[in-house]
Amino acid sequence: MNDGTRNLYIYGAQSIAHGMACALRARGCAVAGYVVTERGAAPAVLDGLPVHEIGELRDDDAASTFLLAVPPYLHDEIRGILAAHGYHHATGLDPATEYREMSAYLRGKGFPSLDLPADGGTGVSRETEARDAAANSAAPRADAAAQALAASGVSIYVACSAADPPLVHARPDSPIYHTVQAGAALSPAIGAELRDDTGETISRENPHCDELTVTYWAWKNRHDAVKGIAHYRRYLAARPAEYAALLDGTADALLPLPFCCWPDTATQYSRYNAPEAVAAMHAAIAAVHPAEAETARAILAGPYLYNYNMLIARAAVFDDYCAWLFPILAHVRAHAPALFPPDTHTRVCGHLGELLYSIYMISRQDRLRLLHVPKVWLT
């Protein structure tokens, strides 16, 4: 990643970037600092490292190298920004590298995780599979194994909407994936296989809930053995062996690796979102699940966040999570109306969902058998 003779900067200053800085520093790599296009809400110093706006960076070494620790669809744009400032050595962070580095770092920190063999019984390394998936050449496809998974009751619901930009790469061609139009009650049909405004639904809450309207719909209306949620441009790259573990009960859920937050999850969240929303969420937990209120605060005072609202789980676990989650969000909606001005796309419940996802999973690590798998971005 760096030959040791150049300054290494991490481009980005949010969770992906901070996690990679933690992982690299833990194994002895020197990191010169973070670089962002515009500072926005980013702090001036992040975990002891300076955060520079690219226009303010004073590094006369044109050979300095940059790790682009942001979603892949931003890599080309950032390469152009760097080139405009005279920097031409940039490496985009790919899913395989992120998964390898963060797995090692989290394992070293004692983060609990149930692991399958490195090759999942396939003879192909996890890194190779993640890299191939990112290149749109792996993940379950319409072959015999994927057909068997579908026949066994595995369904991954892909939240998509009319606002989604076109992608160069398609989702994996697999019968386990089903596109679902999110917020279908509020927008024209887009040709998705399914809609979230059928049956029992909160489709009209989509401006505040984003993909969680699809999660709710899958909870209330689908009866699969294994349910999962993916997004139009990202998904969890699970292997057949990991789906098999869900089906035979040796695992309960597949999750992305958690992000590392600084100085803690609550502070990082509030840096980019309304602190009032976090306060309303804690009040809702105290009202709906009072026995978990103290635990929730303790978890958000820690460093880990499960992001993206993506999971794949046995139906009993998926449904239990939803039965826990949605009453909290309903309480926030009912008791904090100022967070939801009319005719706005606030995404408040969608963002709070990520905090609640983290609280639910981390607080149940001693009861649930959790597997962590790579997330893949489509571009």
At which residue positions do the language-model features occur?
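A short, charged/proline- and glycine-enriched loop
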Residues: 3-7, 64, 149-155
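ER/Golgi luminal nucleotide-sugar-dependent glycosyltransferases, focusing on the catalytic module
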Residues: 108-379
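Phosphate-bearing ligand-interacting subdomains
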Residues: 39-128
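Short internal beta-strands
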Residues: 32-38
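Glycine-rich adenosine-cofactor-binding loop
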Residues: 4-24
